[in-house]
Amino acid sequence: MKRNILAFMAVMLMLCMSAQTSQAQLKRFSIGPYVEAGFPTGDFSTTHNPGFGVGLGADVKLIAGLTAVGSVGFDYFKGKTIDNGNTKIASAKVIPVRLGLRYQLISILYVKVEGGTANFTGDYNNGTGALVAPGLGIRLLGLDVEGKYEAWFKDGTHGFFGLKAGYNF
């Protein structure tokens, strides 16, 4: 029994020591939550109010300055009542799944382009469409703030300007 406990303690000690030395190395992978605000444009702005979203993003460093990024989230845009209060548009509830690339321009400034699917749920435009989302942002330590334009393509274009803030671990 003592031998098992000593062996376990030795393994734990080695893991702790290796974790301390690996913290000095650069992280190649990070993951973290984000929140975003969306401001509809075009026809989407006539039928929906500004919305919000939450989600989880991840990134993997590839080569100098280039990073693969991905995220999954939930966006909500409340529908408007139009035509003198006679027509109520259903709220847009969307689950976007994005994959893309981020390129570091200078130390904290980056450009990013993402593509993927927009899964509409609920009564508004139910089904799956494509999405594209170019953006410009800053990343300082774990804090990530991005301005972007995102367009969902299903039965027309549903576009919005967004402000996204997240923290990566």
Predicted regions and their residues:
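Cleavable N-terminal export/targeting peptides
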Residues: 1-28
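Short glycine/proline- and aromatic-enriched beta-strand/turn motifs that initiate or cap beta-hairpins
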Residues: 20-62, 152, 160, 164-168
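Outer-membrane beta-barrel channels and translocator barrels
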Residues: 26, 61-65, 106-108, 140-143
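Residues that define the transmembrane beta-barrel architecture of outer-membrane proteins
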Residues: 27-29, 48-52, 91-97, 126-132, ...
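Membrane-embedded beta-strand positions of outer-membrane beta-barrel proteins
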Residues: 31-35, 70-72, 99, 111-113, ...
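Transmembrane beta-strands of outer-membrane beta-barrel pores
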Residues: 35-43, 52, 72-78, 93, ...
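Outer-membrane beta-barrel domain signature
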Residues: 41-47, 59, 83-90, 120-125, ...
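Structural signature of outer-membrane beta-barrel channels/translocons
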Residues: 59-61, 102-104, 137-141, 166-168
